[in-house]
Amino acid sequence: LPIKEFVGLGISPEHGNPNAIVELVEELGVKRLLIRVPTWQVEQLDPYLQFAELFQHHRILINVLQDRQHVAEPERWLNTTSRIINSFSALTNEFQLGNAINRSKWGCQNTQDYLNLLDCNVELKRQYPQIQFAGSSVIDFEPLSTLRTLFNFHQYQLDACSALLYVNRRGSPYSKQFGLFDLEKKIRILAALVSLSNRCDHKLWITEVNWPLLNTKPYTPNSGHPRSTVDEDTQAQYLTEYFEIAQQTGLVDRVYWWQLINPGYGLVDHRGDELRKMPSFYAFKRLLEPSHS
């Protein structure tokens, strides 16, 4: 897989001047971009759409975010998601359904809540046969939650499995959870689940990963825990290792770093009067250079 097909980056209209973001994206040379669109902003989609239109020559994945109101009313989720697809379908045919579905702060109190939303995908697929839908959207390595979204007797069908495969709590991508599972093994397990799934085509997209930075509160929630936060040079090293490990497995179609501008875990610090490119910015740029192997 060509490296520009593999490497992706999350961007947001909420941090930084849009024109500056365009320039940063161009400097990096990244072609795949992820933009979050919250369901609770469905009446104010114009700013998100105008932002996305700045990148119409890129390959955009829209991540539709859920909240409790939309989880509690699947019909509302269906209508809102349809409106978002209608708004963005001139720019992209790729949509990720939900985000961190195994964390209650995003509205799903259990996996069944999310399965109720995925049931709407039967209708979405009928309405939009040309759209590629990614789902599962489990954060961290919780294979039982992933399993429930990929093996069941529901009727929905996904085009790709999205995984928010953070490993920062272990430190390095080579560190092992439970003494067994480093990043490569986690990917192999998720890929095996995807390959056997009866609800999903055999594609694995890692749609979020980052390493939070030390001493950057309030921009990262866990700055007080050195075990899961790193200095800027270490972040750049782990970023490089993560993308290289994931690509070398041959089991992942793409990986997106979340996100471009954020002082707590991004590639660029926007505090102060100017945008400061951190070591991870240059590490990400090197990934995309033809000389990188």
Predicted regions mapped to residue ranges:
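Cell-envelope and extracellular/periplasmic
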Residues: 37-38, 99-100, 165-166, 209, ...
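Flexible loop/turn segments at secondary-structure boundaries
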Residues: 16-18, 41-42, 142-143, 169-170, ...
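Noncatalytic carbohydrate-binding groove/subsite architecture in carbohydrate-active enzymes
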Residues: 111-242
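A generic structural signal for ordered alpha-helices
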Residues: 2-4, 11, 73, 168, ...
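Surface-exposed, active-site-proximal loop segments in enzymatic domains
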Residues: 66-80, 100-111, 170-176, 215-227, ...
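Non-catalytic accessory regions flanking glycosidase/transglycosidase catalytic cores in CAZymes
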Residues: 1-94, 103-141, 153-157, 196-205, ...
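Aromatic/acidic polysaccharide-binding cleft in carbohydrate-active enzymes
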Residues: 206-285
